């Protein structure tokens, strides 16, 4: 009976796992093992760059590559892993439930942005966790020019001072000037629980981060957190109010729920 290596996820981890597997199988002339990839779409999405403009360009189709290398792509979303039975239950593109068997399983489902139960967060904040969410942010920013010229219009609050938060914040001054004009006076504020700039990055790189953000005019609000978001801005834990037309949430990620099943 032919064996199957099933890979959940078509991101960088799943993509390279599939190519590595077919390469090794070819080197050892193993015709008795197939490689399958289960993911919602056969696309490689460059997630670390979703904070940039023109986010729709940050993806490429994997269909031809999978076909050329003999990888079988199965469109669907994995829902449950049964380790004892060596099966994966998934939802296909029609919304129907189906099951796949496997001989070996590679879980490369990645992580998701953590969205805590904060008042107004999901309704009023943006994020760059997926292309779809990043496109929503981009559309919103393009519409800023139609809003009244107030300080809030040119203010962006970024919640979270990790890699994604810093990269997003550093991109914003230039984006605001491009959209609102060279005379725009952007205000970009990173809200972070840490007690020092770039605390989560380590002490060695912190001075570099502090210098780079200062040169761009990015502010830091340290030892603080967002407790509420509305259409006009945020409220911080100490009661401080920041009016901002744009709020971007980047504070933390969590592993795929599938990891608890293996």
What are these regions (language model features)?
Residues 13, 110-113, 253-255:
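Short glycine-rich anion-binding loops that position phosphate/pyrophosphate groups of nucleotides
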Residues 34, 73-84, 174-262:
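A Rossmann-like FAD-binding core segment of flavoenzymes
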Residues 138-186:
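Rossmann-like NAD(P)H-binding beta-loop-alpha module
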